[in-house]
Structures are given as C-alpha cells and as structure tokens.
Amino acid sequence: NQFIHKLNNGFIIPNNLNNRLFNLLNAKYVLSLRSINTPGYKLVYQEGETKVFENANALPRFFYVKKVTYVNKERALETLFSNSFNPVKEAVVEMKGQTLGFKDYVGVGNIDVIEYGASRVVIQTDNQKINYLVFLDAYYPNWRVFVDNVEKVIYPTNYAFRGLEVPAGKHRVVFSFSVL
C-alpha cells in the first residue's frame, strides 16, 4: 500500500509513531521489541521482550470532520502529506471530474455502532446538521452504503478509506459488501 510505504518506506518504527497520519490508521495498539517513549503511547502489556503499547491518539473507526478537501486521485497523497493537513479535523476526498475544492461541515454528532461484520456494518448517526463521516476501513468499490434504505455514494477518503455525507437528524447507515 502506497500510504503505508509513504509513512516511512514501508516500515513503522518507533521514531515515526508520532506521525499524525499513523493515527489515521486506527492503530490503537503497537507491538515492539523496543521501548516507545513517544508521547501518547503507554505500555499496557509485556511478555518476554515483546511489549504492547496503547496509542491514545489513534482515531476512532468512525468520526466526523469539519472540513473536506476534494481533489483528484493524483493530488490525494500530496494533500494528505502536506504539513497543513490535520486528520482529526479534515478529510481528503477523491473525486473524478467533479468540482474540486473545499467544503465545511459541523464535525460534531453521535455515531453508535450497531453491527460490525466482515460484509455488513450498521451504525446509527445523530447530528444537528449535515456532516461528513470518515470510516477507517479500506475503500473498495464493491462496498455500498444505504442511509435509511436509500443508496448513497461512498467516496475514497484519505486515500485508503471510506467516507460519505450524512444528512442532519437520526439515521441508520448500512454498509454492505456486494460481489456484483
């Protein structure tokens, strides 16, 4: 994966664990044979020389962002790795031949996971205004999404993940994998 490779030539080593994009991988735990003294990491288990550290800064599986930058595929990685990109507050969304630019959202709301399986994920959302939902699970074209039984578009988000606009109010969002 080009995303992992770009982090540090394919290797995630203790000296780059504070990379803000590492937190975008939703990596809550890190195994290491060495101690990690990076802020935000706490040793939670050790057996022999193997240590397990908890990453307090790992982003959740689902979250809303305040800003979306719409780019073409060629600019996605460049935008993600720019010094100004903050994965906690914004997302980079790949668009094909559509209007590129920025869009602001509220970035606040409730997300409850109802069901999480290999080919079906169900969440309940509740937000006062339209929001952009980032789902830190691999983007793949065969995934479909339904908001209150109405099919919506899943966008490639932050290069490797999924995202979609969620309307204001309470909604049932169902992601399902289709081989057709």
Q: Locations of the language-model features?
A:
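Extracytoplasmic
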Residues: 1-106, 122, 128, 150
